[in-house]
Amino acid sequence: MSEYKNALPRLHQRYEDVLKKQLREQFGYANELQVPKLEKIVLNMGVGEAAGDQKKLDAAVAEMTVISGQKPVKTLARKAIAGFKIREGLPIGCKVTLRRARMYEFLDRLVTIAMPRIRDFRGLPANKGFDGHGNFAMGIKEQIVFPEIEYDKIDAVRGMDIIFVTSAKSDAEAKALLKAFDLPFNG
């Protein structure tokens, strides 16, 4: 039997071995289960042009699959908007929810490979993006920052939203957790 069969992703191992203890000391938790943890990462890509051309949505789904390693689900319009030629129930985007090993592997690639490739990147805003309940949302303007996407094979540059859902009770706890995972906050 291989010793790597049940190996944890690098960041998950670091969380279990080092970060849990650090966060417990920093916030003075009495119980180890109180320590905030990353529960899921949601990637969302809105494709407005999909209303007129479903091929654009299919291309976005393919790109999201390559980036996340998991097939996304198409999101449907909740209500009709005549000005944008959108009918209720029309597919206009895609999203994928990453948990467990895939979540930690995506976070590792995001922090070590994708973020350094963002042009004029000076870090994430320290006080924006938190929702007051321990979750953090950020946006990426170009999907080409991920090395899995080949620049020659894309039809359009698309952005995406990345939402980090944590078990933290406050924004300060969530920020400390994400900072411990090396997310580059500028403040």
UniProtKB/Swiss-Prot annotation:
Gene Ontology molecular functions: rRNA binding; structural constituent of ribosome; tRNA binding
Keyword Transmembrane helix appears in the UniProt entry: no
Protein name: Large ribosomal subunit protein uL5
Domain of life of the native organism: Bacteria
PANTHER family in UniProt: 60S RIBOSOMAL PROTEIN L11-RELATED (PTHR11994)
Entry GO CC: ribonucleoprotein complex; ribosome
Family: Belongs to the universal ribosomal protein uL5 family.
Keywords assigned: Ribonucleoprotein, Ribosomal protein, RNA-binding, rRNA-binding, tRNA-binding
A Pfam family hit: Ribosomal_L5
Database matches in NCBIfam families: PRK00010.1
Gene that this polypeptide is encoded by: rplE
GO biological process terms held by the UniProt record: translation
Record's subunit section: Part of the 50S ribosomal subunit; part of the 5S rRNA/L5/L18/L25 subcomplex. Contacts the 5S rRNA and the P site tRNA. Forms a bridge to the 30S subunit in the 70S ribosome.
Function: This is one of the proteins that bind and probably mediate the attachment of the 5S RNA into the large ribosomal subunit, where it forms part of the central protuberance. In the 70S ribosome it contacts protein S13 of the 30S subunit (bridge B1b), connecting the 2 subunits; this bridge is implicated in subunit movement. Contacts the P site tRNA; the 5S rRNA and some of its associated proteins might help stabilize positioning of ribosome-bound tRNAs.
Taxonomic lineage from the root: Bacteria, Pseudomonadati, Pseudomonadota, Alphaproteobacteria, Acetobacterales
Key word Ribonucleoprotein present: yes
